[in-house]
């Protein structure tokens, strides 16, 4: 996903304003008939497929602003009630939870929230999980056997695995830290982070880390499941040097990460925004998203085209709703010298 800074976002806002003069984008005062503005941090192809399906089904146009989820959350917080956004779709739950904590999100229709398990949505009903991915360990089958894999996330960052593992400080990492905080405590999480810094190898992206494992550059890496499944669909799982591993039991390393969406309290087109959120959890909306990425649907009864194993076989002791904005995770990373 292309990185867009605040200046780029502001410049795109100017461009949007100019487009409104020529009928390309209708002004905010006409939002009730003009459609929706969605700030999007989720994978662009996924959201574009969802929006296309929604517009086809409803006739409601949706204008996208694409950037990294934390940047968009900060932008919305800065804009406050003046934000042109009606909706925010975040690749992870912490950025949208930060808006929840600031009181900037509106209530989602309870009938919509009832469509999916409560563990995938905010406890106060202000955001919902749209797709799910799991935290896993990607390992090279030629460099380590499943029997020799660590039995707990806490073994990473110890001398026993020095130089053998990689990690990525984004896209699921903060949730990983918060899970350890919830299960093991703050001191244990800080010690774990210091161990990662001392004994692990940092990669600038989960895809890069997964590729490094596949190519034999390193034995294993903490990652999200969908990078490996995308590669497996492309090349065939039987042809890969790497495989996925999950920790046994209720280990703190087992996490559900969700892409999450919510409606801004300041939206002037809330009826259409509620309709969009409901569509996200419909069969049509879910199928549009999971066709583009190896993430799980949150709606029961659907099958991913990426041949994902059942989520029933994966146990996570901490729910996405319990992760919060992950501000504690960032503080711990700074204290450990990782950022």
Predicted regions: what is each one?
Residues 8-28:
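N-terminal export signals
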Residues 32-42, 61-65, 164:
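Short, well-ordered beta-strand elements
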Residues 41, 45-48, 71, 83-218, ...:
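Extracytoplasmic ligand-binding site segments that recognize negatively charged/polar headgroups
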Residues 41-61:
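Short, polar/charged alpha-helical segment
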Residues 94-98, 220-240:
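A ligand-binding cleft/hinge motif common to bilobed small-molecule-binding domains
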Residues 133, 161-168, 193-196, 201-203, 238-265, 279-302:
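Periplasmic-binding protein-like
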Residues 138-143, 181-182, 256-269, 288:
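A bilobed periplasmic-binding-protein/Venus flytrap-type ligand-binding module shared by bacterial periplasmic
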């Amino acid at each position: 996903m292309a990185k867009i800074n605040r200046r780029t976002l502001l410049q795109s806002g100017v461009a949007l304003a100019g487009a409104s003069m020529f009928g390309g984008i209708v002004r905010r005062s006409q939002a009730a008939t003009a459609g929706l503005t969605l700030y999007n941090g989720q994978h662009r192809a996924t959201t574009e497929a969802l929006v296309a399906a929604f517009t086809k089904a409803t006739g409601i146009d949706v204008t996208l602003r694409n950037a990294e989820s934390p940047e968009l959350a900060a932008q919305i917080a800065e804009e406050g009630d003046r934000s042109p956004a009606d909706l925010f779709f975040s690749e992870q739950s912490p950025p949208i939870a930060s808006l929840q904590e600031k009181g900037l999100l509106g209530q989602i229709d309870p009938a919509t929230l009832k469509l999916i398990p409560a563990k995938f949505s905010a406890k106060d009903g202000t955001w919902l999980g749209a797709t799910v991915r799991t935290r896993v360990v990607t390992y090279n089958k030629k460099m380590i056997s499943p029997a020799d894999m660590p039995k707990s996330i806490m073994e990473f960052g110890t001398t026993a695995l020095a130089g053998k593992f990689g990690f990525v400080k984004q896209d699921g990492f903060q949730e990983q830290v918060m899970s350890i905080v919830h299960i093991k405590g703050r001191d244990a999480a800080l010690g774990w982070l210091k161990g990662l810094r001392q004994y692990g190898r940092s990669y600038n992206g989960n895809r890069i880390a997964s590729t490094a494992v596949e190519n034999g550059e390193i034995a294993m890496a903490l990652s999200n499941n969908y990078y490996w499944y995308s590669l497996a669909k492309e090349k065939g799982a039987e042809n890969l040097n790497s495989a996925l591993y999950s920790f046994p039991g209720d280990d703190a390393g087992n996490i559900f990460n969700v892409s999450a969406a919510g409606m801004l309290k300041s939206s002037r087109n809330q009826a259409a925004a509620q309709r969009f959120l409901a569509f996200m959890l419909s069969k049509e909306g879910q199928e549009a998203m999971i066709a583009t990425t190896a993430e799980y649907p949150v709606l029961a009864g659907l099958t991913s085209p990426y041949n994902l194993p059942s989520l029933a076989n994966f146990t996570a002791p901490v729910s996405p709703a319990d992760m919060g904005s992950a501000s504690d995770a960032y503080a711990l990373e700074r204290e450990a010298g990782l950022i």
